[in-house]
């Protein structure tokens, strides 16, 4: 079994689609943990629809994505965890795909379909509409047509599956970041420094609406303002700016391995 961890923040419409896909498209019953990161009243009517199929953890006030994820993983009862955002739509047999392609010491990214592109992460592009008019059945019909079994090494991004023990070994996501951005780069860098490997599977593709509650949502301006300070914190901590280097655990200027925090 897999523990699927879904942090959610003020996005009831897409959360409904996410949970519908997670519950309907699993090949067997898994643990689905929803961490409500504040404003619980806005999504309570959605959560009630799935109350017998999910575990709900609620913060009265917004604590941030990092705290929500760490809390969700701490409460996961399975060793294999999968972390997604509430703006993901899961494909058929998502759990079977993870079980087939995730190996010990590996962090497995599940490929995504983006509505616009091309982007920096080289995701396939096809627009299935806004949440209010999302073409759910069309997505499920189209997605298998672009699957292939070749694993690639361009992982280290959301959504991803891994071992709970590996997640806890590096302390999860660093809550020093007061932003939903950059903290994931920090997390994957810590994993790389402990020798974990990264891969991406295209046996399945989750759909991604994209930052509906952060960059593009009702609190978008507030969240965008946190990205710069988060990048500064990353540089203070690691000595390099957060960028997509081929090997982010090495300083691109010197080639030397970064041993720890730069104080």
Language-model-detected regions and their locations in the chain:
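A conserved acidic beta->alpha catalytic loop
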Residues: 36-45, 89
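A short, conserved alpha-helix in the catalytic core of glycosyltransferases
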Residues: 154-171, 177-204
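Conserved donor NDP-sugar-binding/catalytic core segment of glycosyltransferases
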Residues: 92-130
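Short, acidic, metal-binding catalytic loop of nucleotide-sugar glycosyltransferases
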Residues: 20-29
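Active-site donor/metal-binding and catalytic loop motifs
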Residues: 178, 200-221
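Glycine-rich, basic loop-to-helix element that forms the pyrophosphate-binding segment
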Residues: 59-76
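Short aromatic/hydrophobic "clamp" motif used to bind/position activated sugar donors
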Residues: 81
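A recurrent flexible, glycine/aromatic-enriched loop bordering the glycosyltransferase active site
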Residues: 66, 139-162
């Amino acid at each position: 079994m897999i523990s699927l961890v879904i942090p959610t923040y003020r996005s009831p419409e897409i959360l409904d689609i996410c949970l519908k896909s997670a519950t309907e498209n699993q090949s067997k019953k898994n643990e689905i943990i929803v961490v409500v990161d504040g404003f619980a009243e806005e999504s309570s009517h959605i959560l009630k629809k799935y109350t017998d199929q999910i575990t709900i953890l609620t913060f009265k006030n917004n604590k941030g994505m990092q705290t929500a994820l760490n809390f969700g993983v701490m409460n996961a009862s399975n060793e294999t965890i999968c972390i997604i955002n509430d703006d993901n739509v899961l494909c058929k047999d998502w759990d079977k795909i993870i079980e087939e392609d995730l190996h010990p010491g590996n962090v497995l990214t599940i490929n995504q379909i983006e509505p616009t592109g091309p982007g920096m992460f080289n995701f396939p592009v096809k627009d299935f509409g806004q949440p209010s008019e999302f073409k759910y059945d069309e997505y499920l019909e189209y997605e298998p047509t672009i699957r292939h079994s070749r694993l690639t090494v361009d992982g280290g991004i959301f959504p991803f599956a891994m071992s709970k023990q590996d997640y806890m070994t590096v302390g999860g996501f660093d809550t020093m970041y007061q932003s939903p951005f950059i903290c994931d780069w920090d997390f994957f860098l810590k994993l790389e420094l402990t020798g974990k490997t990264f891969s991406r599977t295209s046996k399945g593709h989750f759909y991604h609406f994209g930052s509906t509650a952060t960059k593009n949502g009702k609190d978008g301006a507030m969240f965008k303002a946190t990205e710069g300070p988060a990048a500064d914190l990353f540089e203070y901590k690691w000595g390099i700016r957060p960028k997509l280097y081929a090997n982010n655990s090495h300083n691109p200027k010197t080639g030397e391995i970064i041993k720890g925090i730069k104080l």
